[in-house]
Amino acid sequence: MKPKNYKTITLEEYYDFALKACRHIALEHGYAVAVHGTMKTDLDLVAVPWVSKAIHPKTLANKFLKILGGEKNALWDTEVRSVHGHLKYTIILPLDFEYGKTPYIDLTI
């Protein structure tokens, strides 16, 4: 899913669009999503299970990947955990913005 005329929007506007899409998917599957970061270079998201029957974290990450048309990073199939044991995924977004950097989402569940 890409916003219309994505080449005419800023990176921050694209991240805002991606955040809304991720929150919609998360809500449908028992999660709440919060931003932790500035949304200037990447989009740092935390997904928190909100109901007892929330889907598996990797399933949620795969749903985000699909809705955004993103690509898996090299560690996608390796279980990477944060210091506190949360699962971590990086979604490479298939867009290039004028400043030449590829946007991505760092997702912690």
Q: What residues fall within each predicted segment?
A:
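Preference for bulky hydrophobic residues occupying beta-strand positions
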Residues: L45-A47, L95, L107
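Active-site nucleotide-donor binding segment shared across nucleotidyl transfer reactions
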Residues: A18-L60
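Metal-dependent nucleotidyltransferase catalytic core
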Residues: K4-D16, P49-T102
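N-terminal, Lys/Arg- and Ser/Thr-rich interaction peptides
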Residues: M1-N5, A32
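A short acidic-to-branched-hydrophobic micro-motif
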Residues: T102-I109
